[in-house]
Regions:
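Nuclease catalytic cores that cleave nucleic-acid phosphodiester bonds
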Residues: 1-151
């Protein structure tokens, strides 16, 4: 088992690595060269660098993830793709993502993308997520602990 972190979209990488270390589980941080920081690396954290091209990190994560692994990502399409592989997917707010939860999220993501690409509407009126909080960080660590103990 390993914890794979989508390094381009996930905050609190250090806390995720520490949680893995506590249980003897290594973390693999997949990130573009643009987001790399040596501060994250130690004997329990390995960086896998990818080119700074669209979906490059997502493809690498899909190739690395095996049954029993935990992936931490905020990427909705990536979460959806990982559902078939018996991988536990957790977002940075501590929500464990399931396939049945994903369908509405994927539909919304697709519609928003179509609106943005059309260029007809500059602002969709859709707001981004609320500010990341200490409660969110606590939920993330709790979800990781639960996933580690449950596998």
């Amino acid at each position: 088992m390993k914890i794979i972190i989508d390094g381009d979209s996930t905050p609190n990488k250090t806390e995720i690595i520490e949680t893995g270390r506590k249980h003897g589980i290594k973390a693999v941080i997949v990130l573009s060269t643009e987001h790399f920081s040596e501060k994250l690396l130690d004997s329990y954290a390995e960086a896998v660098l990818v080119d700074n091209r669209p979906q490059e990190a997502d493809i690498k994560i899909m190739n690395l993830a095996k049954a029993g692994d935990i992936v931490v990502t905020n990427d909705i399409p990536l979460s959806f793709m990982l559902q078939g592989g018996k991988v536990t997917v957790i977002n940075s707010r501590g929500m464990t993502v399931s396939k049945k939860d994903m369908r509405p999220g994927m539909e919304i993501h697709h519609e928003e993308k179509k609106i943005r690409r059309s260029g007809k509407i500059k602002r969709t009126g859709i707001r981004g997520p609320k500010k990341y909080s200490e409660e969110d960080k606590g939920n993330l660590i709790a979800a990781l602990e639960t996933a580690i103990k449950g596998i």
